[in-house]
Amino acid sequence: MMLPMSSACSGGQFPGASPHGIIPKQFSRAPRIRVSIRGAAGVEKSLGLGRNAGSQQGMHKNELHDKIRKQLRDVQLQPSSYDTAWVAMVPVQGSHQTPRFPQSIEWILQNQYDDGSWGTNLPGLVVNKDILLCTLACVVALKRWNTGRDHISRGLNFIGRNFSVAMDEQTVAPVGFNITFSGLLSLATRTGLELPVMQTDIDGIIHIRKIELERDAYGTASSRRAFMAYVSEGLGNLQDWNQVMAYQRKNGSIFNSPSATAATIIHGHNYSGLAYLDFVTSKFGGPVPVMYPQNAYSQLCMVDTLERMGISESFACEISDILDMTYRLWMHNEEELMLDMRTCAMAFRLLRMHGYDITSDGMAQFVEQSSFDDSIHGYLNDTKALLELYKSSQLRCLEDDLILEEIGSWSARVLLEKISSKMIHISELPEVEYALKCPVYAILERLEQKRNIEQFKTKEQLKIEGFKLLKSGYRGVIPNDEILALAVDEFHSSQSVYQQELQDLNSWVAHTRLDELKFARLMPSITYFSAAAVLLPSESARIAWTQNCILTTTVDDFFDGEGSKEEMENLVKLIEKWDDHGEIGFSSECVEILFYAVYNTSKQIAEKAMPLQKRNAVDHIAESWWFTVRGMLTEAEWRMDKYVPTTVEEYMSAAVDSFAVGPIITSAALFVGPELSEEVFRSEEYIHLMNLANTIGRLLNDMQTYEKEIKMGKVNSVMLHALSHSGGGRGSPEASMEEAKREMRRVLQGCRFELLRLVTRDAGVVPPPCRKLFWLMSKVLHFVYMEKDRYFTAEGMMASANAVILDPLQVTLPPSDSGTL
């Protein structure tokens, strides 16, 4: 996500890199500890369930922040023994007896493990195919220049002892292992190496390569050509090297792969790639990574991970720098960003959600399914790239954005096909199913973050992973353990805050006497969950949001039949008069309780916001309440008079305001950002945002509850649309409720697109933090009405609320050797 020499990132360094290479580090091991964070009455103030079991048994919180911040600013890449070996085999141009990169040979000599192997061979890690591949490559490289006789001997002994691993089809393997490993075996034989392996076993491995080259079991012809170019070093003279050069990047590399680039040079077809290898070996002091550059992908992954784990706010400055640089890469159509499907899609998603002014034009290259099928991603069944495309397609801001529409259509279809045909790896299946079930616009951040924390992989769990799309095991130096520790600590701290705020809200309910209203669906936990789950930034914003959710729900129930016509008219007049309510009086105790709950709470919110707003903004809250109850009264009068609006438009003129988003957002907006002037609240933009949010809520509600509301004698947009197209010569008599719902979904989709466009654009009268509230409200509404009206069947909502506020995390923290957070 960064240019190589950007200020935010130097472009990637190996930890401890020097001209003499990197000495492998040995890591201590200890039993892991199960950590459970209890909520409610059983809140644990620490995560201590064993030795040093704090929020992270190990580093101080500041040290964790510093390590993550360092990785964000300066990508740390693991050296690849496999790729370094191939680079070491490149001769000086015109002299096949002299190595072009002696520093790479020196690194190989200095980085052999005691057991004779090369690669990622940490204590406790079982010998795998990646280690065998790296070891054979390094042995062949040393033999190529007749150096390191003892190293070669120890390496050959290691290969002989573990060769059975190469033949084990159940062992995880790097991409293209059957081709790259057998190619090295052939090369080893030609260089005179005597492998301590039965010739029949060697022949068996080479035969596997022959079978793979002859069959067409994987992908399309185009994807197969791309894949064979990617693993071309394993093909030797079997490769069409002119065809490989079609995949050369501007930097001279083949797929940004040092090994593939080195192979094309060795075979005399890519001397322009020498500049690429010169740069990479110079930058890292001899060794090379498995892919370079990969700054953009590495940093975008870090940003995405921090956001998904709920700790991105602690790194806002670094993330801003990364996204600024990513935006520049995007605008300049840089290959590092645009030529990799997963990187491009992730960049688009993050940039759009952070308000950068980009169109979907950069995604046009993926508008056809063939963009996946004919690529390496398709050949390797790369589900993660496909899933990233699907996620990005959901961020449409324009109804006529056919690019994202087409991407979303085919990517969802392919993912579903892969699920039904069981072509998705078991470890990836939950994430795919979750993404298909829960679209981006219906995900509540805190709920998803808890899920991500509990499923997050530590470094220990990642030891046998990381082979996707890479020829040698790439694990990077992403501080997974530190990220997990901070996320657990932050979630635990947040739960303590949430529980205290919920207690305060329960006290407020009693103080306002709302609990005396028998009809009131108060549900403080569920309503507070909607504020906590979307990560409203301050306590005051969460409290104001929740109080008004409770109030609007209670008032809505009052207008739905619990109040008489006289009482309803009385409440509307009281709210209209506001401070002069004493002139009117109360028609009942119920009206008095409702009015004073609304009135006093609104005044308290406005007074609390005065230090931020530099004025008393209670008039805006009062006005939003008046619009709300006026719409509710109109709907109640329709119901009591058995009047059916003649058009959907007439119905929506009251139903939009009556959905009651106004008081909730207006109150919370006073606490989320800069001062909101009179002009902001009166602006066309603010009014349009409010109308969109209310319309989204109304349509979602109507589509889920129309059957119940018809029985209650209430009108509904779905029913009205069906009626308007079923008789009187005004439309098709065959129109049905399902057809009406489809039309409402189309209108809903258009409103959602327009809302996202307004929220993510980089200009506007309404400040971005305030605009974001409308999108958060839309996400809550989509979540609530995703399957059914969860306010009437609240088990699912209560379970979700408990997950965020009360239920303990179930997570395993890695061991550490020093202090706690």
Swiss-Prot record:
Cofactor details (free text): Binds 3 Mg(2+) ions per subunit.
Binding site for Mg(2+) 2: 556, 560
InterPro entries xref list: Isoprenoid_synthase_dom_sf (IPR008949), Terpene_synth_N (IPR001906), Terpene_synth_N_sf (IPR036965), Terpene_synthase-like (IPR050148), Terpene_synthase_metal-bd (IPR005630), Terpenoid_cyclase/PrenylTrfase (IPR008930)
Enzyme nomenclature, EC number: 4.2.3.103
Motif DDXXD motif per record, residues: 556-560
Pathway: Secondary metabolite biosynthesis; terpenoid biosynthesis
Keyword entries, A-Z: Lyase, Magnesium, Metal-binding, Plant defense
Keyword Lyase: yes
Coiled coil stretches, renumbered: none
Binding site for Mg(2+) 3: 701, 705, 709
Region (Disordered), start-end ranges: 1-23
Tissue: Expressed in roots and stems.
Any one GO MF annotation of this record: terpene synthase activity
Binding of Mg(2+) 1, residues: 556, 560
GO biological process: defense response; diterpenoid biosynthetic process
Cofactor dependence: Mg(2+)
Reactions mediated catalytically: ent-copalyl diphosphate = ent-isokaurene + diphosphate
Function text: Involved in the biosynthesis of ent-kaurene diterpenoids natural products. Catalyzes the conversion of ent-copalyl diphosphate to the phytoalexin precursor ent-isokaur-15-ene.
Annotated family: Belongs to the terpene synthase family.
Domain notes: The Asp-Asp-Xaa-Xaa-Asp/Glu (DDXXD/E) motif is important for the catalytic activity, presumably through binding to Mg(2+).
Other remarks on this protein: Phytoalexins are diterpenoid secondary metabolites involved in the defense mechanism of the plant and produced in response to attack (by a pathogen, elicitor or UV irradiation).
Identification of the protein by name: Ent-isokaur-15-ene synthase
Organism: Oryza sativa subsp. japonica
